[in-house]
């Protein structure tokens, strides 16, 4: 079964982008291609089907130093997985240096690594969470820590899958404002979501996915319209813009 079919997508460095689509559109598979959890079928013409930073072949550990990715799977793995959330905020961020998902049993953690972890937590306004176990954090707190984990290697780009899932209205707004600050600081942001409300003002390009294909792509104002969204969500969607954000309703 083809989940993504003849999908062509280019995101330039510094081009903040939102990938928007309903459930089943292929968003998760697209992320898995970036993380090398899934692999695309070879093209008949021999052209590499996926390139990241211009390269088709990557050492996964090297790639993770340039591309930070935060997914709901990572959240569940660290907070609800084998470690049962017993690791602290600092330990979670430090694990980003070693691409591990749990305790740092065999890693050598230097004072420099701890300093960089503290800096990453501070960027997400999460430094007070350094000593707090993940399973005692709210959803919003844990999400900030996981993004700090992705930032700790100073990546060029950050891919966020449903970044505000599980947050209430106030927490979501504050959280997305912090993502906006990262964008303004020079980190390329790629938001993958099915919520229009999660698209921060800094986003310039929107890609609309539907049934594994790019239904439309272009500048944000021309993509976030009632016409386009009603088509990909297969329902009458109205759009309103306020303070740089877009809001949808049926």
For each feature predicted by the language model, list its residue ranges.
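Conserved ABC ATPase signature
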Residues: 107-108, 133-137
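ABC ATPase nucleotide-binding domains
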Residues: 226, 230-250
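Conserved catalytic motifs of ABC-family nucleotide-binding domains
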Residues: 154
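H-loop/switch region of ABC-family ATPase nucleotide-binding domains
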Residues: 193-194
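Conserved ABC ATPase "signature" region
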Residues: 94, 98, 108-129
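H-loop (His-switch) and adjacent beta-strand-loop-beta switch element
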Residues: 206-219
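Catalytic Walker B motif of ABC-type/P-loop ATPase nucleotide-binding domains
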Residues: 158-162
């Amino acid at each position: 079964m083809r989940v993504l079919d003849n999908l062509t997508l280019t995101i330039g460095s510094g081009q903040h982008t939102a990938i928007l689509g309903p459930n089943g559109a292929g968003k998760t598979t697209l992320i898995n291609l970036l993380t090398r959890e899934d692999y695309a079928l070879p093209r008949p013409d021999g052209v590499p089907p996926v390139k990241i930073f211009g390269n088709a072949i990557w050492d996964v550990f090297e790639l993770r130093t340039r591309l930070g990715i935060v997914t709901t799977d990572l959240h569940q793995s660290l907070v609800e997985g084998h470690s049962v959330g017993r690791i602290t905020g600092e330990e979670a961020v430090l694990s980003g240096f070693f691409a591990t998902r749990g305790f740092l049993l065999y890693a050598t953690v230097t004072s420099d690594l701890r300093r960089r972890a503290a800096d990453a937590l501070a960027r997400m306004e999460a430094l007070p969470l350094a000593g707090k176990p993940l399973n005692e954090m709210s959803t919003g707190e844990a999400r900030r820590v996981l993004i700090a984990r992705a930032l700790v290697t100073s990546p060029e780009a950050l891919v966020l899958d449903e970044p505000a899932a599980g947050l209430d209205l106030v927490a979501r707004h504050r959280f997305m404002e912090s993502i906006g600050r990262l964008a303004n600081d020079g980190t390329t942001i790629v938001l993958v979501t099915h919520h229009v409300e999660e698209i921060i003002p800094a986003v310039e390009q929107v890609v609309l996915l539907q049934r594994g294909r790019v239904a439309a792509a272009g500048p944000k104002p021309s993509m976030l319209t009632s016409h386009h969204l009603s088509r990909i969500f297969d329902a009458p969607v109205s759009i309103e813009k306020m303070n740089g954000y877009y809001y949808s309703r049926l």
